[in-house]
């Protein structure tokens, strides 16, 4: 049985590795993208169930990535991560369908709990 898929989108390698490890251990199948084009490619090919999306990414920003993801898969679940109180971006992303947001530096347990809430692992 295939595990639920999570895509981690962040230009910071350390954060991708950390989240990747945490959710792999939890039993999710994880994918990583460092930028918008990679992220959209993975969304198209792998159809992840949930995306952890950093809003501050060079090139295509988080809002643009979120908009394009929703075009590919309107039901995709997205949790956004922001570096600081970017209230406009948070508001806009929620209007675009983001489930919730976390400010960096985030508490890893809070993100883990949110992912489990929005994407419960199906028991085998």
UniProtKB/Swiss-Prot annotation:
GO cellular component assignments: cytoplasm
Compartment(s) of residence: Cytoplasm
Post-translational events: Phosphorylated by KinA and KinB. Dephosphorylated by RapA and RapB.
Presence of keyword Ribonucleoprotein: no
GO biological process, one term: sporulation resulting in formation of a cellular spore
Main subcellular location of this protein, as a coarse class: cytoplasm
Ligand binding (Mg(2+)): 10-11, 54, 56
EC numbers, comma separated: 2.7.-.-
4-aspartylphosphate modifications at: 54
Chain ranges of the Response regulatory domain: 5-119
Pfam families: Response_reg
Entries under InterPro entries matching the protein: Bact_response_regulator, CheY-like_superfamily, Sig_transdc_resp-reg_receiver
Highest taxon of source: Bacteria
Cofactor: Mg(2+)
UniProt remark on cofactor binding: Binds 1 Mg(2+) ion per subunit.
GO MF entry, a single one: kinase activity
EC class name: transferase
Keywords attached to this entry: Cytoplasm, Kinase, Magnesium, Metal-binding, Phosphoprotein, Sporulation, Transferase, Two-component regulatory system
Function recorded in the entry: Key element in the phosphorelay regulating sporulation initiation. Phosphorylation of spo0B during sporulation initiation.
Stated name of the protein: Sporulation initiation phosphotransferase F
UniProt source species: Bacillus subtilis (strain 168)
